[in-house]
C-alpha cells in the first residue's frame, strides 16, 4: 500500500494496511501534528497555538504507532525519502565508505519560491512550514548517512541534540517592490534552519526555505576528514539551456519551480532518475521481494519526526533540545 494521502491520515491508514498484512510505503513526513488530539470543529488557526512540546509528543506517538503496527504484523514500513536513493547520494556514500573518512560537517538545503497549494500556508493541513515540508529531505539524508557510517565501524551514530530557528521572512518583503516569492503564510514559517549534533560530536545543518527564485535547489554538502562531496539533486549541470525569451521551448518542462524558460536554465534530462524517485521505488520492491530491510524505513521516518518537532520546540523556547 502506497500512502500518498494527507498527513493526518498516515497513522490510521498504515495501521489498517498492516492489519491486512500489506507492506507499506509512506511519503514524508511519516507523521505530523495537525491537531489530531484537539476537539472536532476547532478553527484552523487554533491548531498552531498548541504548545510545541505537546506537538512533539503527539507526532512521535503517531510515528511510533506506525512502526510498531508494522512490526507486529510482520510487514515492512518504508519511508519515502528520495534523497537517500538519489544516484549522486548513493555514489557519495560509497566513496565515503571506501575512504573510511569521518563525515564531520554536513550542510543540506531544499529551497524554492513557495508551495503552489494554499493548504501549505496553514499548520492545520501541513503540520508546520518550510522545516517539515522542505528541510525534512536533507535531515533524512544526513541521519541515513551517519547511521551507515557508524555501521561500517560497528558502532551506532545517532542524533542527540538539535537547535533551530524558524521565521516567515516573506513579511519583510513588504518593504520592497511586489515580491515574486509566495506570500500570505498564515501560521507557518517559510524558512527554517536546524542544527543536529550527532553522538560522535559531528554536526549537520539543514535549511528549508520558500525564498528561492530561479527554480528548486536540493543540495547536500559533506565535509569529511579526508575528502568532501557536493551532492546536487537539483539543479544539476547535465544539461544547460539558454533562451532569449520565455516560451521558446513551447510547453516543455524545464525544472521544478522554474518560473521562466528565458535566460540560462538547467533542464533535467530524467528527473525521476536524478531525484532518486525511480531508484527508491525499485529498492522498495526489491526489499519486499527479498525480505530485507531498506535504508529508508519507518525508523528513519520516526527519527526525522523526532528531529523536526524537537526543532520546533527549540525555536519556540530558544534552547537546545535533547533527543534522547
Protein language model regions, located:
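C-terminal helix-rich "cap/oligomerization" subdomain common to oxidoreductases
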Residues: 1-2, 48, 72, 268-269, ...
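Redox-cofactor binding/interface segments in oxidoreductases and associated redox assembly factors
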Residues: 2-3, 26, 108
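N-terminal glycine-rich "phosphate-gripper" loop used for MgATP/nucleotide binding
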Residues: 4-8
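Beta-strand-loop-alpha-helix segment that lines the small-molecule cofactor/substrate pocket
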Residues: 11-81
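Charged, glycine/proline-rich intrinsically disordered loops and linkers
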Residues: 33-61, 170-184, 245-267
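Predominantly a Rossmann-like dinucleotide-binding segment in NAD(P)-dependent oxidoreductases
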Residues: 71-185, 318
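Contiguous beta-strand/loop segments that form the cofactor/metal-binding neighborhood of enzyme cores
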Residues: 137-245, 278-292, 309-310
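Active-site loop of classical SDR/Rossmann-like NAD(P)-dependent oxidoreductases
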Residues: 269-281
Amino acid at each position: 500500500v502506497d500512502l500518498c494521502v494527507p498527513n493526518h491520515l498516515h497513522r490510521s491508514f498504515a495501521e489498517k494496511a498492516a492489519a491486512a498484512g500489506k507492506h507499506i510505503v509512506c511519503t514524508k513526513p511519516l507523521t505530523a501534528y495537525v491537531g489530531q488530539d484537539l476537539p472536532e470543529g476547532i478553527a484552523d488557526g487554533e491548531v498552531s497555538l498548541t504548545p510545541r512540546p505537546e506537538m512533539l509528543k503527539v507526532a512521535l506517538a503517531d510515528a511510533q504507532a506506525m512502526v510498531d503496527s508494522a512490526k507486529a504484523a510482520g510487514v515492512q514500513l518504508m519511508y519515502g525519502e528520495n534523497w537517500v536513493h538519489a544516484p549522486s547520494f548513493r555514489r557519495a556514500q560509497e566513496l565515503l565508505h571506501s575512504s573510511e573518512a569521518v563525515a564531520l560537517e554536513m550542510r543540506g538545503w531544499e529551497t524554492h519560491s513557495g508551495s503552489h497549494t494554499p493548504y501549505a500556508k496553514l499548520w492545520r493541513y501541513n503540520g508546520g512550514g518550510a522545516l517539515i515540508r522542505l528541510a525534512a529531505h536533507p535531515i533524512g539524508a544526513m541521519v541515513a548517512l551517519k547511521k551507515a557510517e557508524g555501521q561500517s565501524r560497528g558502532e551506532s551514530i545517532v542524533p542527540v541534540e538539535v537547535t533551530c530557528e524558524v521565521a516567515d521572512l516573506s513579511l519583510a518583503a513588504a518593504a520592497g517592490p511586489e515580491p515574486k516569492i509566495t506570500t500570505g503564510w498564515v501560521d507557518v514559517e517559510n524558512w527554517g534552519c536546524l542544527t543536529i549534533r550527532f553522538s560522535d560530536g559531528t554536526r549537520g545543518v539543514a535549511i528549508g526555505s520558500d525564498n528561492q527564485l530561479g527554480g528548486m535547489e536540493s543540495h547536500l554538502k559533506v565535509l569529511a576528514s579526508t575528502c568532501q562531496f557536493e551532492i546536487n539533486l537539483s539543479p544539476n549541470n547535465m544539461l544547460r539551456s539558454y533562451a532569449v525569451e520565455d516560451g521558446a521551448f513551447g510547453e516543455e518542462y524545464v525544472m521544478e519551480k522554474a518560473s521562466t524558460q528565458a535566460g540560462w536554465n538547467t533542464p533535467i534530462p530524467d528527473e525521476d532518475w536524478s531525484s532518486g524517485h525511480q531508484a527508491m521505488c525499485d529498492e522498495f520492491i526489491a526489499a519486499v521481494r527479498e525480505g530485507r530491510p531498506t535504508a529508508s524505513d519507518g525508523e528513519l521516518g520516526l527519527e526525522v519526526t523526532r528531529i523536526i518537532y524537537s526543532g520546533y520546540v527549540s525555536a519556540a523556547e530558544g534552547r537546545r533540545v535533547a533527543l534522547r
